[in-house]
Every structure is written in C-alpha cells, then in structure tokens.
Design a protein with these regions (language model features):
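Hydrophobic/aromatic ligand-binding patch that stacks against planar heteroaromatic rings
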Residues: 30-32, 141, 188-189
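Short, well-ordered beta-strand core segments
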Residues: 38-40, 149, 196-198
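Conserved P-loop
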Residues: 2, 6-86, 90-98, 274-286
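Conserved nucleotide-binding/hydrolysis micro-motifs of P-loop NTPases
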Residues: 44-48, 90-91, 155-160, 202-205, ...
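Amphipathic alpha-helical transducer elements in NTP-driven molecular machines
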Residues: 57-68, 78, 83, 121-136, ...
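Interfaces that engage single-stranded nucleic acids at replication/repair/recombination sites
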Residues: 5, 11-14, 26, 34-35, ...
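P-loop NTPase motor core
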Residues: 91-184
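Conserved GTP-binding G-domain of TRAFAC-class P-loop NTPases and closely related GTPase folds
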Residues: 161-278, 282
Length: 346
C-alpha cells in the first residue's frame, strides 16, 4: 500500500500543552482555574485559597504515581476533567533535584550529601534535568488520553548578551538552578509547549514620562526581546486575562465554559455559575491599554481623526483600527506623541 493513500487534510484537533508563566501574584493559577474542567497537581500549596479540585503532591514519586493513576482513569473514560494543571513547573524541577539527592544517598560513594551541587561536575543538575524531561513524556501520556496539559511557572529576569548588540534583560521561565545548569530543562519545556503565555502587570506612564505599575494585567502570546512567548493558534499578541477567551482560542469553540467538569461531574464552585467572561469590548480595551503609552492622549488623537467620538473609550475603537494598533503599537504611540506636540501625524 502506498503511503500516499494515508494523506489527510485539514486541522487536526488535539489536546494542547500550555505553559503559563509570570511574576508572583499576577494571577497565573487563577487563570488556569478558568481553563476547561481543571484538575490541579499542587506542588507548593499555592491553590489553598482557591475553590478548585486538586491533588497535593510533595515529592517526585508522588507525582509519578498521580500521573499514572490519572492516565489510567482518563484512558478508561472515568476522569471527569479536561485539563491537567501542574502548579508549578519550577517546584517540579525542585522535586527532581531532591530525588537525585535521595537516589545518591541510597548508595553513597563518598558519604551522604544534602545538596545537588555536591555531585561533582554538574552531574547532579544533569540528572535532575533528565528526570524533569522524563516527566514531560509522562504528561504526554496523559495528553494522549485526551487531557489538555497546563504547566504554571514563575519567571525570572535574565541578562541576554547577543553577539551582535548590547546586553539587555528579559523575562524568562524560572527553573531553580543556576542559569547555565537550568538551560536543558527550560529549553525542553519551551519546545514541549504548544503555547507559552506570559502574564504580567501592565506598565503605564505618567505625564512626566515616569513608568508606573498598576493593577491592569495582560497576557502576551508572541515572543519579544523582553519576554518569551509563543502560540500556534493565531492569538492576538496581547490579551486580557480572560480564561474563557483564551480557552476558546487554544482549545476550540467546543471547550465548554470555564470550570465545567466533563461527564456531568459536580462543579468545583458548588453549583454556582462561573463569573461572566469579559465582553469583547472589555477585552479589546485591556489589550489596547497594555500597548498604549498614554490612553488619554490616544483617545484625543483618535477623536481628532474621527475614529471615535467624544465620550467613547478604548472598548469602542473599531475592531479593524484596534487590530492596527496592536500590530504596530510603536508606530501608533509615535503618531500620538507627534499629535500632542502639534506636529504632523502619520
């Protein structure tokens, strides 16, 4: 039989592998809790304040056991969940490091150790990274049984020294090891993910040009010099932290509402309806606010151009024009700046 007879055409829907990372307290776990029918594997008791279904795991063996049980139940159609959430990936690496120490101490050659660094020549870190990568394969087993996989990670700021230019800093996924030793695990995790979503607080600017943090948060889905991100789903470059819309784009229209367990299992919110998803206008306003330097000046600029009328806000900017802003925010901000300075606008 010719292999050409096996050609298939069209989009193939498969469970997705998603990495959600960002600074402490930005809402990563809350965002993951809004993905379709989530079950958390909580490695650091970070979900205690949340009304979610969870399995507490505190060491490598417990993680493997939990994953094996989940795989069996999912394969047999007995698991009332659609998304497996690992909270967090960096603590998962810590589990691997502690397991390396346990294995070494089980038959010590030169006495027992308490630190992975005591295993010379970086061998301990290499073994921990190998264990970490092995867990990614176990996650894929669960994925083959129909589960989406979401891995939550913290972030760290690293210095990048490109050979062709000046050094700069960027947000990157945190692995609790020295940067050089963490490369293998981190790069494998990035390759493994179908989407990497960077969550962060939006920096705005005062009239004096000073940067100011705020409560507004955004999800960044495309790689930039200052952060790691990717997606294979045509997602907007900047999005509001709206789990419903993110689920629709990642998992498809049939993913179901946030926090709705599969197969009629009881809802994690005790039967209460999930909070309503943000409107399209609200999502657009959040996305625009994330890339516009001065919202007040931008509104004045768009009013002068007849894009919007006085009294309207970012949520009422025509979708086509909003898409242009999001595609080339620097150009738009320059035009606004020239307008405010009285110069010719592009």
């Amino acid at each position: 039989m010719s292999l050409l007879q096996n050609i298939k055409r069209g989009v193939q829907q498969r469970p997705q592998r998603v990495i959600i990372y960002g600074p402490e307290g930005v809402g990563k776990s809350t965002l993951a809790a809004g993905l379709p029918a989530p079950l958390f594997l909580d490695t650091e008791e970070g979900t205690q304040h949340m009304n979610v279904d969870r399995i507490q795991v505190d060491h490598y063996g417990a993680m493997l056991e939990a994953l094996q049980d989940i795989y069996k139940e999912a394969r047999n159609g007995n698991l009332p969940y659609k998304t497996l959430v690992i909270d967090t990936g960096d603590r998962l690496w810590d589990m691997c490091a502690r397991q390396v120490i346990r294995d070494y101490n089980a038959s010590p050659k030169d006495g027992k150790i308490s630190s992975i660094e005591s295993i010379g020549y970086g061998k301990g870190y290499a073994q921990a990274s190998e264990m970490f990568v092995n867990l990614l394969s176990v996650f894929d087993n669960c994925r083959s049984a129909g589960l989406h996989i979401a891995v939550i990670c913290h972030c760290r700021v690293e210095t990048v020294n490109p050979p062709e230019g000046e050094a700069y800093t960027m947000y990157t996924i945190k692995i609790n090891a020295p940067a050089k030793q963490a490369i293998t695990a981190k790069e494998k995790l990035k390759e493994w993910g179908d989407a990497i979503l960077f969550c962060n607080y939006v920096t705005t600017f005062t009239d004096g040009g000073k940067a100011k943090g705020g409560e507004l948060r955004a999800v960044y889905t495309e790689h930039r010099a200052t952060w790691e991100a990717k997606n294979r789903h045509g997602m907007p470059a900047v999005m509001a932290m709206d789990a419903g819309e993110i689920s629709r784009l990642l998992f498809g229209a049939g993913c179901g509402p946030a926090n709705a367990p599969a197969n009629g299992a009881p809802a994690a919110n005790n039967g209460q309806a999930p909070p309503p998803a943000a409107s399209a206008g609200d999502r657009q306003a959040d996305a625009l606010a994330a890339v516009i330097d001065h919202a007040k000046d931008a509104l004045a600029f768009m009013i002068s151009r007849g894009i919007i009328t006085a009294g309207q806000g970012l949520e009422e900017v025509p979708a086509e024009y909003a898409a242009r802003i999001l595609k080339t925010p620097a150009r738009f901000n320059n035009s606004v700046k020239e307008f405010m300075e009285g110069g010719a606008c592009r």
